[in-house]
């Protein structure tokens, strides 16, 4: 009896120690996924429109299936999606960032972002940044013209998306999204700095008011239309209080505790002919 009791004690002790070791390993694994260092790599992916019809897909339009496969790949490979607030919280010491973090962005605010992307973000517990052209959303809010093909999100759509916790709304200008008289928010040829400052400020502030009124949250990031900017543009955007800017330049980003690391972030356009795996390999090769 005594020997049996001893055996039981040995077995119990072994099981207990195994459990302790397992918990320690699991806890360590969780800790390893959080970056407590002074810098974090951040690839930013740029999407625009999501449509099922292959005939309508192009350099800026991919299928909802491709987007879902992207989310699956990211989840299966340990990536965590972040938004601008996560970055600013990290910079100012309010939180850590995941070691393998990535930002997904949608430009222009197409209605199909609401129709296709939002349910998929909810399904895979992912977040994204959507930057609508405020004047276009204003128009579709007034006309109530709903179309997955050509429509844009309304202010009510923005509110719902923002409240979901899966989408962050940022500023993409009110109506400076053209290649005609000027390229995006760039100055016109021969335009004085004073005139340019007045026009840019009026446009961006108007967009800020509409977006904040719609969501109850003030945008903190300016997303350059076409990625077009110059030194004066960046200076004026900073003076308006934006803590982050996004470009269309394909380059890797290193986020540090320095607030300046959030300006002029590079983004990689999501090409439908490239796998997410290859895209991320490209970002690593450029790091």
Placement of each model-derived feature along the sequence:
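A cross-kingdom marker for long, charged
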Residues: 229-232, 236, 244, 249-281
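Substrate-binding cleft of extracellular glycoside hydrolase catalytic domains
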Residues: 86, 105-110, 123-126
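N-terminal pre-catalytic segment of deacetylase/amide-hydrolase enzymes
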Residues: 8-16, 20-102, 263, 267-271, ...
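Membrane-embedded segments
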Residues: 90, 99, 105, 109-117
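Extracellular/periplasmic catalytic domains that process cell-envelope and extracellular macromolecules
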Residues: 36-40, 95-98, 122-125, 161-164, ...
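Active-site environment of divalent metal-dependent phosphoester hydrolases
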Residues: 111-113, 176-178, 226-232, 252-255
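Metal-dependent polysaccharide deacetylase catalytic core of the NodB/CE4 family, i.e.
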Residues: 45, 49-52, 57, 100-102, ...
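N-terminal Lys/Arg-rich, disordered targeting/topogenic segments
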Residues: 1-7
